[in-house]
Design a protein with these regions (language model features):
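NTP-dependent small-molecule kinase module
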Residues: 193, 198-251
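Short beta-strand-centered segment that lines the nucleotide-binding/catalytic pocket of NTP-utilizing
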Residues: 75-86
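Glycine-rich phosphate-binding P-loop
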Residues: 52-69
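A glycine- and Lys/Arg-enriched "phosphate-lid" helix/loop adjacent to the NTP-binding pocket
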Residues: 12, 122-139, 147-199, 247-249
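Conserved nucleotide-binding/hydrolysis micro-motifs of P-loop NTPases
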Residues: 85-88, 114-117, 160-167, 221-225
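Charged, amphipathic alpha-helical linker segments immediately N-terminal to NTP-binding catalytic cores
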Residues: 1-27
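Phosphate-binding P-loop
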Residues: 36-47
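P-loop NTPase motor core
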Residues: 85-146
Length: 251
C-alpha cells in the first residue's frame, strides 16, 4: 500500500459550511500576500512563494487554482501552466525553463504542472531515458533545497482522485460543449496507464518529499473539500515560514 492508498477520498463538507470556510481562508491569504509584498504592516518584503500543483488529469487543479487566487490582485500573483518543452528549451538542461518564472522576494507564483513532469509523464511515456529520469530525483531535491535555502516558501500539492471519479469527470467534460476542450486524446490514453502512473507518483513522493519541501496530498473527490484544503495548506505553509515576520527584506 502506498501513500495514495491511505487517503480517505470520501471526505466532504456541506456546501454552506465549505463556502464560509473558503471565504475566510481566501481573506487570510489576501492578508498574507499583502504582507509579503510589503503593502500591509511593514514595507519590508517577504520571501518568495512558489506553489506547485500536480495531480491526475481532471483532478481539479484548475478549479483549485482559481479559488486560490480569487481574492488576490492579479498584479500580485503569476499563474503559469507547463506542458511539453519547446525545441529551444530542449537545447538546455531540463530545469532551465523554470528558472525565468520563479518568483523573487515579495513575489508569488502558482505553477499548474512543473518540473515533476520529468519523473511522471516523461518517465511513463518514455520521453526521458531511464538514467535521465532516475537522476532527476537527485536534481529535483538539490534544486528545491537551493530554492528553500534562499528563502523560497515552496508548497507542493498533489490532488488525488479515485479512478471512478476521474471517469465521471471525463464523461461530464465530454457531454459539456464548454468543457469538452479539456478532454484530450492524451487524457484518455493516460487513463489506460493509470497503474503505471500511480507507481511513478508513489516513487515521486518517496524520492522528493523532504523535510524542507514536503508533498501535501489533497483528497480531491469532493471539489469543495479539495479547494478548501488547498487554500488552508498554502496559508499554513506561509504562516509557518514567516512566523512573526523575521524573514523579511527591508525596503
Amino acid at each position: 500500500m502506498g501513500r495514495l492508498d491511505e487517503l480517505d477520498l470520501s471526505v466532504s463538507l456541506p456546501k454552506k459550511k465549505a463556502k464560509k470556510r473558503l471565504r475566510k481562508e481566501q481573506r487570510k491569504l489576501l492578508a498574507l500576500r499583502l504582507r509579503l509584498a510589503g503593502l500591509v504592516g511593514s514595507d519590508a518584503i517577504g520571501p518568495p512563494v512558489c506553489i506547485v500543483f500536480e495531480g491526475w488529469d481532471a483532478s481539479g487543479k484548475g478549479g483549485a487554482i482559481k479559488r486560490l487566487v480569487k481574492q488576490l490582485d492579479p498584479r500580485h500573483v503569476r499563474v503559469r501552466s507547463f506542458s511539453a518543452p519547446t525545441d529551444d528549451e530542449q537545447r538546455h538542461h531540463w530545469l532551465w525553463r523554470f528558472w525565468p518564472v520563479l518568483p523573487g522576494w515579495g513575489g508569488m507564483a502558482v505553477f499548474d504542472r512543473s518540473w515533476y513532469g520529468r519523473v511522471l509523464v516523461e518517465r511513463v511515456e518514455e520521453y526521458a531515458e531511464p538514467d535521465a529520469w532516475q537522476r532527476a530525483y537527485t536534481e529535483i531535491r538539490e534544486f528545491e533545497s537551493m530554492l528553500v535555502a534562499e528563502g523560497t516558501i515552496l508548497v507542493k500539492l498533489w490532488i488525488h482522485i479515485s479512478d471512478e471519479e476521474q471517469l465521471r469527470r471525463f464523461e461530464a467534460r465530454k457531454d459539456d460543449p464548454l468543457k469538452s476542450w479539456k478532454l484530450t486524446e492524451e487524457d484518455l490514453r493516460n487513463r489506460k496507464k493509470r497503474d503505471v502512473y500511480a507507481e511513478a507518483v508513489e516513487d515521486m513522493l518517496e524520492q522528493t518529499s523532504t523535510t524542507q519541501a514536503p508533498w501535501h496530498l489533497i483528497e480531491g473527490d469532493s471539489k469543495r473539500f479539495a479547494r478548501l484544503r488547498v487554500v488552508e495548506t498554502v496559508n499554513q505553509a506561509i504562516e509557518a515560514a514567516i512566523g512573526g515576520g523575521q524573514n523579511a527584506k527591508g525596503s
